[in-house]
């Protein structure tokens, strides 16, 4: 009479599981592009930001993504008025 044996082989190495980490976004290069006292041409980007961390002052416009840019050529001046940080462009 023949005996039938059921043999089950187990894995000698565990299967490699996936992780939920391992992603990162590209940096957005936010911040000041020109500093206080520098000369800016009309249309030059002064400050890239999300939200209005710094508000536009004289001769400074705000883009759709809250980027501050010079409306005319001149010297950049960062100032604080009424508890708000502002950036302005003044003629020489």
UniProtKB/Swiss-Prot annotation:
KW Cell division (keyword) present: no
Keywords tagged on the record: Ribonucleoprotein, Ribosomal protein
One annotated GO biological process: translation
GO CC terms in record: cytosolic large ribosomal subunit
Family (UniProt): Belongs to the bacterial ribosomal protein bL27 family.
NCBIfam families: L27
Protein name: Large ribosomal subunit protein bL27
Organism: Aster yellows witches'-broom phytoplasma (strain AYWB)
Gene of this entry: rpmA
């Amino acid at each position: 009479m023949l005996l039938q044996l059921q043999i089950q082989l187990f894995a000698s190495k565990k299967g490699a599981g996936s992780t939920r980490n391992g992603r990162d976004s590209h940096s957005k290069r936010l911040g000041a592009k020109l500093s206080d006292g520098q000369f800016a041409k009309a249309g030059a980007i002064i400050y890239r930001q999300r939200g209005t961390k710094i508000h536009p002052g004289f001769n400074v416009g705000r883009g759709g993504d809250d980027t501050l840019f010079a409306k005319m050529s001149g010297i950049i001046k960062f100032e604080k008025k009424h508890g708000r940080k502002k950036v302005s462009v003044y003629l020489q």
